[in-house]
Amino acid sequence: MLKLLQQYEYKIIYKRMLYTCFILFIYILGTNISIVSYNDMQVKHESFFKIAISNMGGDVNTLNIFTLGLGPWLTSMIILMLISYRNMDKYMKQTSLEKHYKERILTLILSVIQSYFVIHEYVSKERVHQDNIYLTILILVTGTMLLVWLADKNSRYGIAGPMPIVMVSIIKSMMHQKMEYIDASHIVIALLIILVIITLFILLFIELVEVRIPYIDLMNVSATNMKSYLSWKVNPAGSITLMMSISAFVFLKSGIHFILSMFNKSISDDMPMLTFDSPVGISVYLVIQMLLGYFLSRFLINTKQKSKDFLKSGNYFSGVKPGKDTERYLNYQARRVCWFGLALVTVIIGIPLYFTLFVPHLSTEIYFSVQLIVLVYISINIAETIRTYLYFDKYKPFLNQYW
């Protein structure tokens, strides 16, 4: 084992794995530091909302220092992405320090709003009146900023940024779910299992399949057997869209509650129109999922920059003029790819959610299946990241000559 670790081609990946494990150890330790005892928490029947929080690294079963998870940070990234979408050139010219400060300041503001909402919705009224609510908010905000810092450090020195934290949070949430006796026939149960397996295969298809757009490369005109192409994934945004859409939905609910509570202290915490027990709440979430997924995918593809790169290099698409025509052609192709991928993901997530409205006695099992699907999707992305680091091994014969 020691000899294996000493080989350079594996050294980077092992260092990153160890760093990620250390980050996860701190995260697990933090989730076990309770601010309020379990007996002082309100019992909520909206189980999927708790599951949604866990998909951002949070936990509302107990009020701990990492209860908010990465939700405020993901929401701040969404807001900044939408602001910069209209002028990507200006965004690309910003320094890392400028982006960092904007993200952190916005995360701080959103953390305060979401902390206020979580305390009033999940902590008993007696405990809220007894404790210093501002001190509790300060602890939650501090824990959130610490978790954001850990996720940022993992992006630089670990593997897959915030995804391992979210994956551990989902696993923890799945283990805490109480699976009661299933009041359904064996045919229905078998059908659910088959649907989950089919869904996982579709997600694997979405993640691994890519769309290739051939173009003429002026540097390789002599190589007739080598074709140049521009490749995009069917869902360019990947699993980060699921976390961001849940974060935006949670912030929407907490933001509306925060504003209404300023004018009416006796406002209901439940807001049934924005829950997953309501078709309106599910529809709002799916619309957010599609819109954010589309904007994030277009942001990552960045067709405007791609058209500029083609204009500078002299490469072109057959039958398409350079410049504005190339940009319009790429925009058309990008819209087709993004909407197709997002439609598949939205249908996969949406059908089980709507299904719980018709068979509420199977809601726990359906939510468990949805969480399993999200877990597999995130695991695929983490595996892709690890495989990228392992590509170094393929160049060993060449690099050893110069090392």
Curated annotation (Swiss-Prot):
Phenotype when the gene is knocked out: No effect on cell growth, significantly reduces export of the cell wall protein SraP. The small amount that is exported seems to be glycosylated normally. A double secG/secY2 mutant enters stationary phase earlier and has significant differences in the export pattern of a number of extracellular proteins (shown in RN4220). Single or double deletions are as virulent as wild-type (shown in RN4220 and SH1000).
InterPro entries attached to this UniProt entry: SecY/SEC61-alpha (IPR002208), SecY2 (IPR014269), SecY_dom_sf (IPR023201)
Coiled coil feature spans: none
UniProt main location, coarse: membrane
Membrane topology: Multi-pass membrane protein
GO biological process, one term: SRP-dependent cotranslational protein targeting to membrane, translocation
Molecular function GO terms recorded: protein transmembrane transporter activity; signal sequence binding
Transmembrane helix found in the keyword field: yes
Annotated keywords: Cell membrane, Membrane, Protein transport, Translocation, Transmembrane, Transmembrane helix, Transport
Keyword Ligase appears in the UniProt entry: no
Compartments it resides in: Cell membrane
Transmembrane segments: 17-37, 63-83, 105-125, 131-151, 157-177, 186-206, 240-260, 276-296, 339-359, 366-386
GO cellular component: cell envelope Sec protein transport complex; plasma membrane
Functional description taken from the UniProt entry: The central subunit of a protein translocation channel (Potential). Part of the accessory SecA2/SecY2 system specifically required to export SraP, a serine-rich repeat cell wall protein encoded upstream in the same operon.
Assembly and interaction partners: May form heterotrimers with SecE and SecG subunits (Potential). Component of the accessory SecA2/SecY2 protein translocase complex required to export cell wall protein SrpA.
Family in the record: Belongs to the SecY/SEC61-alpha family. SecY2 subfamily.
Protein name, as recorded: Accessory Sec system protein translocase subunit SecY2
Species assigned in the record: Staphylococcus aureus (strain NCTC 8325 / PS 47)
